[in-house]
Amino acid sequence: MPETRTIASSLGGYLRTRRALVSPADVGLPPTGRRRVPGLRREEVAELVGLSTDYYVRLEQGRADRPSAEVLDALARALQLSAAERAHLYDLARPRRGAASRTEAAVRPALRQVVQAIPSTPALIMNDRNDVLAWNPLAAALIADFPQLRPHERNMARRIFLDPDARQVHPDWDEAARSTVGMLRMAAGRRPNDPALVRLIGELSLGSPAFRTLWATHYVHEKTHGPKRFRHPVVGEVALRYETFQAPGTAHQLLVVYTAAPGSPAEEALTFLGMLTRA
């Protein structure tokens, strides 16, 4: 299994990956002919940020201690980072002292009741390790038979990368895989010493070449909202949208609710599945 600090993306690795994605033209620099590597050179990033090249090199080599907020904000602008990518940069560069090393594994009974009380659309609670902690009957009917799975198997990253039927269940597998890796990257930045996260990423790295390839991109993703498709053996493909809500008073527990457009085939499919779950 990889070492913890290898699994949690280092600041240097993240900076190198991100500057390779930004062309000189993207930041208004003149072309300089053929380049050996894609993206910006170290000295170009340093110039954009207002740093010496030596200091920026020390940042990429992990030899600069806790860069200031001003430096990190300037790096985020120069590398054109999104809000999630900027947050990840801060996590890597300025780890919070005393931060919890693991994610809560239990759901408050009242939160579990909230999920169960959602009658007509799939809903679940997951953490940023992708552990599914609570679900309603429609989520179990559509996504996976969570009650029949062992606790460690109730993890969407394992379902995506290690389940041989994953591409059948998830018609949008490529996007689902990329966003799942992005969530794990953000979690690793927040909690590089979380033992369960270390074990999970090690297991996925050993078991899935696709995961290893995506992990090497340093892509980060914060689950918020968007389209999601599932394929069910009885009702076929179901096109939904999801919205994500941070569960109050918990560490990185998310309520995810999937909804169908009114009058759509997906709504009819969910209605039929709901009838089956009550039969």
Regions found by a protein language model. Name each.
Residues 1-16, 67-110, 128:
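Short amphipathic recognition helices of helix-turn-helix/homeodomain-type DNA-binding modules
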Residues 16-23, 90, 94, 116, ...:
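Amphipathic, well-packed alpha-helical segments that form the structural scaffold of globular domains
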Residues 109-127, 132-279:
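Hydrophobic protein-protein interaction segments
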Residues 26-39, 99-110, 116-117:
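An N-terminal domain-cap segment
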Residues 1-40:
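A short, Lys/Arg-rich alpha-helix, primarily the initiator
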Residues 32-36, 42-43, 49-66, 74-76:
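Recognition helix of helix-turn-helix/homeodomain-like DNA-binding domains
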